[in-house]
Amino acid sequence: MKNVYIYCEGATEESFINEILYPYFFNAEIAVYPIICTTKRTANKKYKGGVSDKIKKELTTLCKQHHNEYVTTMFDYYAMPDNTPGLDCVEPDIHKRIKYIEHTIDADINQQNCSFHFMLHEFEGILFSKPDSFVLVANDDVVRHIHTISDSYPTPEHINNSPQTAPSKRLEALIPNYAKIKNGTLLSKDMGIDIIMERCPHFRGWIQKIISLGSAD
């Protein structure tokens, strides 16, 4: 059994890792463990260095503590500060751009066992992979609206990056009592990781990279 530590932003990601990713990877003889960062990002506060000095320090420490194991992240790309390493990339293809940014951050952190990963554009984006699952938490009109949003983009990872139209903002507007942790996990379980991977190529690449560790020496 190989261990992978996923440095993440909060309880929503922690629940997803424990309830969805852990059983999936366990079958590949990989155990994933969430580590919640202590630096909270908010809309009104941006930290120096984009991926802040504190995040970099915590992630570096984690990598050194587990130097023979793999460390990755589960951070929202949405609302990252402008001075995040690599964020000045002008590549129009979001999937190429995000890989460049992740590689730039990896170079900045400079730990061989670290692979930075962003959720495009945030965790809630992957929930648009299967709009029919929203019948569990919303009425038929809302489900139809979510279908319309999903159908308007090439992938759920393209649902865009503004305070009004980010995936979580859309869900909060459509479902006033939306509970991020509880509903996010419920919806993810219903749609299943295979559907999410099919619809979200950047997420799929991350999962496949972790899976590849199971066959590595």
Regions from the language model: what does each represent?
Residues 6-8:
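Short hydrophobic beta-strand that contains or immediately precedes a catalytic carboxylate
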